[in-house]
Amino acid sequence: ADKYEKSHLMRWIKALEIVIMLGAAAAFIFNSMLLLIGLLFLMGLQSTLFGPVKYSILPQHLKPEELVGGNGWVEMGTFLAILIGTLLGGVLIAIQGQGPWLVGGVVVILAILGFLSSLFIPRAAPDAPDLRINWNPFSETWRTIAITRRNRTVFLSVLGISWFWFLGATYLAQLPNYTKLTLGGDEHVVTLLLTTFALGIGIGSLLCERLSGRRVELGLVPFGAIGLTVFGVDLFFAAVPVAPEASLIGAVEFL
Protein backbone atom coordinates (compact mmCIF):
# COMPACT_ATOMS: atom_id res chain seq x y z
CA ALA A 1 0.00 0.00 0.00
CA ASP A 2 2.91 2.40 0.66
CA LYS A 3 5.28 1.26 -2.10
CA TYR A 4 3.00 1.44 -5.16
CA GLU A 5 0.48 3.86 -6.65
CA LYS A 6 -2.71 2.94 -4.84
CA SER A 7 -5.41 3.21 -7.52
CA HIS A 8 -3.36 1.03 -9.89
CA LEU A 9 -2.77 -1.49 -7.11
CA MET A 10 -6.49 -1.62 -6.29
CA ARG A 11 -7.36 -2.37 -9.91
CA TRP A 12 -4.91 -5.27 -10.01
CA ILE A 13 -6.32 -6.67 -6.77
CA LYS A 14 -9.90 -6.37 -8.07
CA ALA A 15 -8.85 -8.06 -11.32
CA LEU A 16 -7.45 -10.91 -9.23
CA GLU A 17 -10.84 -11.16 -7.56
CA ILE A 18 -12.51 -11.79 -10.93
CA VAL A 19 -10.16 -14.71 -11.59
CA ILE A 20 -10.83 -16.16 -8.12
CA MET A 21 -14.60 -15.78 -8.53
CA LEU A 22 -14.53 -17.52 -11.92
CA GLY A 23 -12.86 -20.42 -10.15
CA ALA A 24 -15.45 -20.24 -7.36
CA ALA A 25 -18.29 -20.35 -9.88
CA ALA A 26 -16.80 -23.50 -11.42
CA ALA A 27 -16.33 -25.03 -7.97
CA PHE A 28 -19.98 -24.39 -7.08
CA ILE A 29 -21.27 -25.79 -10.37
CA PHE A 30 -19.11 -28.94 -10.20
CA ASN A 31 -19.57 -29.28 -6.43
CA SER A 32 -15.82 -29.33 -5.72
CA MET A 33 -15.39 -28.81 -1.98
CA LEU A 34 -11.59 -29.01 -2.14
CA LEU A 35 -11.43 -26.29 -4.79
CA LEU A 36 -13.82 -24.09 -2.78
CA ILE A 37 -11.60 -24.36 0.30
CA GLY A 38 -8.55 -23.38 -1.75
CA LEU A 39 -10.39 -20.43 -3.30
CA LEU A 40 -11.62 -19.36 0.13
CA PHE A 41 -7.97 -19.12 1.17
CA LEU A 42 -7.22 -17.03 -1.92
CA MET A 43 -10.12 -14.68 -1.14
CA GLY A 44 -8.74 -14.24 2.36
CA LEU A 45 -5.38 -13.37 0.79
CA GLN A 46 -7.06 -10.95 -1.62
CA SER A 47 -8.90 -9.24 1.24
CA THR A 48 -5.63 -8.96 3.17
CA LEU A 49 -4.02 -7.22 0.21
CA PHE A 50 -6.99 -4.92 -0.42
CA GLY A 51 -7.64 -3.85 3.19
CA PRO A 52 -4.51 -1.74 3.80
CA VAL A 53 -4.89 -0.02 0.43
CA LYS A 54 -8.53 0.98 0.89
CA TYR A 55 -7.79 2.54 4.27
CA SER A 56 -4.46 4.18 3.43
CA ILE A 57 -5.88 5.89 0.34
CA LEU A 58 -8.40 7.87 2.40
CA PRO A 59 -5.97 10.48 3.85
CA GLN A 60 -4.77 11.27 0.33
CA HIS A 61 -8.24 12.19 -0.93
CA LEU A 62 -10.08 13.41 2.18
CA LYS A 63 -9.62 16.51 4.30
CA PRO A 64 -8.62 15.96 7.95
CA GLU A 65 -12.16 16.74 9.12
CA GLU A 66 -13.54 14.17 6.64
CA LEU A 67 -11.35 11.25 7.73
CA VAL A 68 -13.58 9.99 10.54
CA GLY A 69 -16.66 10.08 8.32
CA GLY A 70 -14.78 8.41 5.47
CA ASN A 71 -13.57 5.62 7.72
CA GLY A 72 -17.10 5.23 9.04
CA TRP A 73 -18.53 4.83 5.56
CA VAL A 74 -15.86 2.30 4.58
CA GLU A 75 -16.41 0.31 7.80
CA MET A 76 -20.18 0.37 7.37
CA GLY A 77 -19.96 -0.64 3.72
CA THR A 78 -17.58 -3.50 4.52
CA PHE A 79 -19.78 -5.04 7.21
CA LEU A 80 -23.02 -4.48 5.30
CA ALA A 81 -21.50 -6.20 2.27
CA ILE A 82 -20.43 -9.17 4.41
CA LEU A 83 -23.86 -9.52 6.00
CA ILE A 84 -25.84 -9.00 2.79
CA GLY A 85 -23.60 -11.51 1.03
CA THR A 86 -24.17 -14.02 3.82
CA LEU A 87 -27.94 -13.61 3.56
CA LEU A 88 -28.08 -13.56 -0.24
CA GLY A 89 -25.77 -16.56 -0.55
CA GLY A 90 -27.97 -18.61 1.76
CA VAL A 91 -31.11 -17.68 -0.17
CA LEU A 92 -29.64 -18.37 -3.62
CA ILE A 93 -27.93 -21.68 -2.81
CA ALA A 94 -31.21 -23.01 -1.39
CA ILE A 95 -33.03 -22.63 -4.73
CA GLN A 96 -33.60 -26.18 -5.89
CA GLY A 97 -31.63 -27.15 -8.99
CA GLN A 98 -30.38 -23.64 -9.77
CA GLY A 99 -28.60 -22.66 -6.55
CA PRO A 100 -24.96 -23.33 -7.58
CA TRP A 101 -25.44 -21.63 -10.95
CA LEU A 102 -27.06 -18.56 -9.37
CA VAL A 103 -24.39 -18.21 -6.69
CA GLY A 104 -21.60 -18.66 -9.22
CA GLY A 105 -23.11 -16.11 -11.58
CA VAL A 106 -23.71 -13.53 -8.85
CA VAL A 107 -20.17 -13.70 -7.42
CA VAL A 108 -18.65 -13.26 -10.89
CA ILE A 109 -20.94 -10.31 -11.71
CA LEU A 110 -20.16 -8.63 -8.39
CA ALA A 111 -16.43 -9.11 -8.95
CA ILE A 112 -16.70 -7.50 -12.40
CA LEU A 113 -18.71 -4.59 -10.97
CA GLY A 114 -16.06 -4.13 -8.29
CA PHE A 115 -13.32 -3.97 -10.91
CA LEU A 116 -15.29 -1.47 -13.02
CA SER A 117 -15.80 0.69 -9.92
CA SER A 118 -12.05 0.64 -9.25
CA LEU A 119 -11.47 2.30 -12.63
CA PHE A 120 -12.96 5.51 -11.22
CA ILE A 121 -10.65 5.68 -8.19
CA PRO A 122 -8.40 8.76 -8.51
CA ARG A 123 -4.64 8.35 -8.45
CA ALA A 124 -2.82 8.31 -5.12
CA ALA A 125 0.96 8.59 -5.15
CA PRO A 126 2.97 6.01 -3.20
CA ASP A 127 4.04 7.13 0.27
CA ALA A 128 7.29 5.14 0.30
CA PRO A 129 8.31 4.11 -3.24
CA ASP A 130 11.73 2.94 -2.04
CA LEU A 131 10.27 0.63 0.60
CA ARG A 132 11.78 -2.86 0.61
CA ILE A 133 9.14 -5.58 1.01
CA ASN A 134 9.86 -8.45 3.39
CA TRP A 135 8.16 -11.57 2.01
CA ASN A 136 8.49 -13.47 5.30
CA PRO A 137 5.06 -13.00 6.95
CA PHE A 138 6.25 -14.07 10.40
CA SER A 139 9.24 -11.76 10.76
CA GLU A 140 7.38 -8.88 9.10
CA THR A 141 4.37 -9.28 11.40
CA TRP A 142 6.66 -9.27 14.44
CA ARG A 143 8.45 -6.19 13.09
CA THR A 144 5.15 -4.39 12.49
CA ILE A 145 3.97 -5.12 16.03
CA ALA A 146 7.29 -3.83 17.38
CA ILE A 147 6.88 -0.59 15.40
CA THR A 148 3.32 -0.02 16.67
CA ARG A 149 4.41 -0.59 20.26
CA ARG A 150 6.68 2.46 20.01
CA ASN A 151 3.57 4.64 19.77
CA ARG A 152 1.13 3.88 22.58
CA THR A 153 -1.79 5.57 20.80
CA VAL A 154 -1.30 3.57 17.62
CA PHE A 155 -0.76 0.32 19.51
CA LEU A 156 -3.96 0.73 21.55
CA SER A 157 -5.88 1.60 18.37
CA VAL A 158 -4.61 -1.60 16.73
CA LEU A 159 -5.74 -3.62 19.75
CA GLY A 160 -9.15 -1.92 19.65
CA ILE A 161 -9.83 -2.59 15.97
CA SER A 162 -8.53 -6.15 16.34
CA TRP A 163 -10.94 -6.76 19.22
CA PHE A 164 -13.79 -5.30 17.18
CA TRP A 165 -13.12 -7.57 14.19
CA PHE A 166 -12.59 -10.59 16.42
CA LEU A 167 -15.97 -10.13 18.08
CA GLY A 168 -17.71 -9.17 14.84
CA ALA A 169 -16.49 -12.28 13.02
CA THR A 170 -17.38 -14.46 16.02
CA TYR A 171 -20.92 -13.11 16.25
CA LEU A 172 -21.44 -13.44 12.51
CA ALA A 173 -20.28 -17.07 12.49
CA GLN A 174 -22.18 -18.14 15.61
CA LEU A 175 -25.41 -16.18 15.22
CA PRO A 176 -27.26 -18.88 13.20
CA ASN A 177 -26.42 -21.58 15.79
CA TYR A 178 -27.18 -19.23 18.69
CA THR A 179 -30.56 -18.36 17.16
CA LYS A 180 -31.57 -21.98 16.65
CA LEU A 181 -30.14 -23.67 19.76
CA THR A 182 -30.55 -20.89 22.32
CA LEU A 183 -33.35 -18.63 21.09
CA GLY A 184 -35.34 -21.37 19.34
CA GLY A 185 -35.72 -19.31 16.15
CA ASP A 186 -35.86 -20.46 12.54
CA GLU A 187 -34.03 -19.05 9.51
CA HIS A 188 -36.32 -16.00 9.44
CA VAL A 189 -35.21 -15.07 12.96
CA VAL A 190 -31.58 -15.47 11.83
CA THR A 191 -32.26 -13.03 8.99
CA LEU A 192 -33.92 -10.61 11.42
CA LEU A 193 -30.97 -10.69 13.83
CA LEU A 194 -28.38 -10.36 11.06
CA THR A 195 -30.29 -7.36 9.71
CA THR A 196 -30.39 -5.80 13.18
CA PHE A 197 -26.67 -6.49 13.55
CA ALA A 198 -25.96 -4.78 10.23
CA LEU A 199 -28.10 -1.76 11.11
CA GLY A 200 -26.30 -1.41 14.44
CA ILE A 201 -22.90 -1.39 12.75
CA GLY A 202 -24.07 1.07 10.11
CA ILE A 203 -25.61 3.48 12.62
CA GLY A 204 -22.58 3.22 14.91
CA SER A 205 -20.18 3.91 12.06
CA LEU A 206 -22.07 7.06 11.07
CA LEU A 207 -22.56 8.21 14.67
CA CYS A 208 -18.82 8.03 15.21
CA GLU A 209 -18.36 11.08 12.98
CA ARG A 210 -21.00 13.05 14.88
CA LEU A 211 -19.76 12.06 18.34
CA SER A 212 -16.14 12.82 17.49
CA GLY A 213 -16.92 16.30 16.21
CA ARG A 214 -15.51 15.49 12.75
CA ARG A 215 -12.01 14.94 14.10
CA VAL A 216 -9.96 11.88 15.02
CA GLU A 217 -11.09 11.23 18.59
CA LEU A 218 -9.36 8.26 20.20
CA GLY A 219 -11.36 8.72 23.39
CA LEU A 220 -14.28 6.90 21.75
CA VAL A 221 -12.26 3.71 21.26
CA PRO A 222 -12.26 2.57 24.94
CA PHE A 223 -16.00 3.21 25.21
CA GLY A 224 -16.63 1.11 22.11
CA ALA A 225 -14.40 -1.73 23.32
CA ILE A 226 -16.00 -1.70 26.78
CA GLY A 227 -19.48 -1.67 25.24
CA LEU A 228 -18.69 -4.67 23.04
CA THR A 229 -17.35 -6.62 26.01
CA VAL A 230 -20.07 -5.72 28.53
CA PHE A 231 -22.98 -6.45 26.21
CA GLY A 232 -21.28 -9.65 25.04
CA VAL A 233 -21.12 -10.86 28.66
CA ASP A 234 -24.75 -9.78 29.13
CA LEU A 235 -25.71 -11.84 26.08
CA PHE A 236 -24.07 -14.88 27.67
CA PHE A 237 -25.95 -14.59 30.97
CA ALA A 238 -29.25 -13.81 29.23
CA ALA A 239 -29.05 -16.96 27.10
CA VAL A 240 -31.37 -19.78 28.16
CA PRO A 241 -31.11 -22.84 25.85
CA VAL A 242 -34.43 -24.14 24.54
CA ALA A 243 -35.49 -27.76 24.92
CA PRO A 244 -34.26 -29.98 22.05
CA GLU A 245 -37.79 -31.14 21.26
CA ALA A 246 -39.21 -27.60 21.04
CA SER A 247 -40.32 -26.41 17.60
CA LEU A 248 -38.60 -23.41 16.08
CA ILE A 249 -40.46 -20.10 16.08
CA GLY A 250 -40.70 -17.55 13.27
CA ALA A 251 -39.81 -13.87 13.23
CA VAL A 252 -43.31 -12.69 14.20
CA GLU A 253 -43.51 -15.05 17.18
CA PHE A 254 -39.99 -14.09 18.20
CA LEU A 255 -40.87 -10.39 18.28
What are these regions (language model features)?
Residues 1-255:
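Alpha-helical transmembrane-bundle signature of multi-pass membrane transport and export proteins
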